[in-house]
């Protein structure tokens, strides 16, 4: 029997504790879980992808079956096929997230019907945490330590120094 391989993707700009919670929970569902950092052309980048990847790798190092990858110019389903993933993992905070994700699910299914999508609902303590909200707090000099993993906080501090 082959390994169950999943792929959880996002821009993770920056990664939040909500993302980490979804990754930890999804890691228990698969033999191997890839976390794919994708460049989103519709979002203005805050942290360079290298910083996001380094911080994310540190945040998930306690999860032996999780590997972080990044992609710039590929569709999610193409990355899933390349990695052998048969399931895409998506996190949902609210109905708006579901509506947004459902349109991608439609196209992904059209392009690759063998790849399933599962949705994990955010835990109540993470429902209102978003990367854009964290960026907004940072813009006004607010403390974000309770919203992001320590490794991400380090990457943000290091980036501010440069």
From Swiss-Prot:
It holds the Pfam family CTP_transf_like. Substrate binds at residues 11, 43, 76, 90. Keywords: ATP-binding, Coenzyme A biosynthesis, Cytoplasm, Magnesium, Nucleotide-binding, Nucleotidyltransferase, Transferase. The record marks 19 as: Transition state stabilizer. GO terms for biological process: coenzyme A biosynthetic process. One of its GO terms (molecular function) is ATP binding. PANTHER family: PHOSPHOPANTETHEINE ADENYLYLTRANSFERASE. It catalyses: (R)-4'-phosphopantetheine + ATP + H(+) = 3'-dephospho-CoA + diphosphate. It comes from Streptococcus pneumoniae (strain CGSP14). It is found in: Cytoplasm. One of its GO terms (cellular component) is cytoplasm. Homohexamer. Reversibly transfers an adenylyl group from ATP to 4'-phosphopantetheine, yielding dephospho-CoA (dPCoA) and pyrophosphate. Its EC number is 2.7.7.3. This is Phosphopantetheine adenylyltransferase. Pathway: Cofactor biosynthesis; coenzyme A biosynthesis; CoA from (R)-pantothenate: step 4/5. It is an enzyme of class 2 (transferase). ATP binds at residues 11-12, 19, 91-93, 101, 126-132. It comes from the Bacteria. Its main location: cytoplasm.
């Amino acid at each position: 029997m082959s390994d169950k391989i999943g792929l959880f993707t996002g821009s993770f700009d920056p990664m939040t504790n909500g993302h980490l919670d979804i990754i930890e929970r999804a890691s228990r569902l698969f033999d191997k879980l890839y976390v794919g950092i994708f460049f989103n052309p519709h979002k203005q980048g805050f942290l360079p992808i290298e910083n996001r990847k380094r911080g994310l790798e540190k945040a998930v190092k306690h999860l032996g079956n999780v590997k972080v990858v990044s992609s710039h110019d590929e569709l999610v389903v193409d990355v899933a096929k390349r990695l052998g993933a048969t399931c895409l993992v998506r996190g949902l905070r609210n109905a708006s997230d579901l509506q947004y994700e459902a349109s991608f699910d439609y196209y992904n299914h059209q392009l690759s019907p063998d790849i399933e999508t599962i949705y994990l609902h955010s835990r109540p303590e993470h429902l209102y945490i978003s990367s854009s909200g964290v960026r907004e707090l940072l813009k006004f000099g607010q403390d974000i330590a309770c919203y992001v993993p320590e490794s991400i906080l380090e990457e943000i501090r290091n980036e501010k120094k440069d």
